[in-house]
Amino acid sequence: MSMRSDIIFPALVLAPVFLVLACGPENGREDTPDDISGVSFVKLAPEAMSTPVSVVLEYEIDNDVIVENLTSYPECGICWDTDGTPVIEDNFQAGPKLTRNSGKETQVISNVLLDYGKTYYFRAYFRNSREVYYSEDIVEGRLGEEPSEIKFDWTRLDTPELPSSVSVYFTDSPLDGRPFNAWYAVADVTSSDVELKVNLHDRIKTVDEQAAEDPKCCVLVNAAYFLASGSLGISVVGGSEQGMVTTYRGSLRPEHPEYNSVYPATRGIFGVDADGVPSVYWTGSGGAIYYYDRPLPSLIGSDPYAMMSPKLPSAPVDWEPEYAISAGPVLLYDGKCPFDFTLTGQGEEYYMHNFEMIPYDIFGDDVRPDRTAVGYTEDGRVILFICDGRCEKSHGALLTELAMIMKGLGCTYAVNYDGGGSTRMIVGSKNMNDVTAEASRQVWSSIGFYRK
């Protein structure tokens, strides 16, 4: 399924710009296949769409050319630079998988790959197993205004049962005029006395029960999404990887048009290596488990991407986590929140930046449940965060608000974890957050600080 240009770019329904394949010395090719040499088969909207978290481009590829090259591993995409002559050696992002039904494509270039305040130049490319072909026409674009961090007045709690290297804080400062209660714990897990661990159990348990199992547990919060049958996503415990992140429904509402559509997607993962150094990446599995420095930019209502691989969405990073667990979305990457709630115009849940295909009861501009998040600061300190929601004292947080709260705490990288009734923080043996709305929920996994 392809996104209609008159929906996503209503202001751009103008005469299309024809991108003529440049096959001369500028592109490093003197000989080109006769079947596509000199053919204008890509049409590009004359303007890029700027959002606070991305630049969006729309183009159309001649279907006959795609079909003629299906045996040559065809790929389309966008490349960009800052000096006006982009080639894939500068920066590029492959587009959706090309099939016999491909044609109009919409491609989102995430702020993870761009810097605020800079002007970029974009052009389309098409390549097969032999050649790379560039369009002559180039489109200018830049990110919109960067969202601002959210800061609160925090009170440090008295926690004599914890090592001095672990601190816990509380706030009841209002969030955008709403009642709000939140807690966070912070520690340097590269220190000599505290480490971070992930727990993944063979039976479902409350966070309280999981904390009580180990007297070395200092602070523990819930972690991954789950079903009754077990934890979802990818986890790493003691260096051993398990699980998968592959494809997801476009919507979990049976009545939604995208309920029966599936999209490959990466999901956010937080973890530490054997030295306790924290990292945040996107993870996906396509025959193996991969970690990436960018999301697969899947777009609901548009053509799906190919499965994650050693090339898509990029070459994997070389990361060997000792403890890690996925959920999502990534809230912060290099200090930038890579999503907002911009809609494509196709209807409810058709978000421009829900790359991780997060369900409607978690991702949305009116969804404010309890939240759990984990992140780390520029100097490597890990922060475990929770907030209450859906109760009189605390009305919860949007995911975009959660990202800016984590940024306000000094985080440069952060991941959202399961929330709602799953959200719990245990400090020592004490539960921090509200438990009146729902009995303590059993969960399959948790993440926290432990004495060494």
Predicted feature residues:
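C-terminal motif of bacterial Sec signal peptides marking the signal peptidase cleavage site
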Residues: V20-A22
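Short acidic-glycine loop/turn motifs at beta-strand connectors
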Residues: D188-S191, G271-P278, L332-G335, Y376-G380, ...
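Bacterial N-terminal signal peptides that target proteins for export
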Residues: S2-L12
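Conserved, well-ordered active-site substructure
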Residues: G230-N260, Y351-Y413, S422-K452
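Short glycine-rich loop/turn motifs
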Residues: P179-Y184, R267, S326-G328, R368-A373, ...
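Active-site-adjacent helix-turn-beta-strand microarchitecture at beta-sheet edges
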Residues: G230-F363
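Short, surface-exposed linear motifs at loops/turns and structural transition points
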Residues: G28-E145
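Zymogen propeptides
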Residues: E146-G287
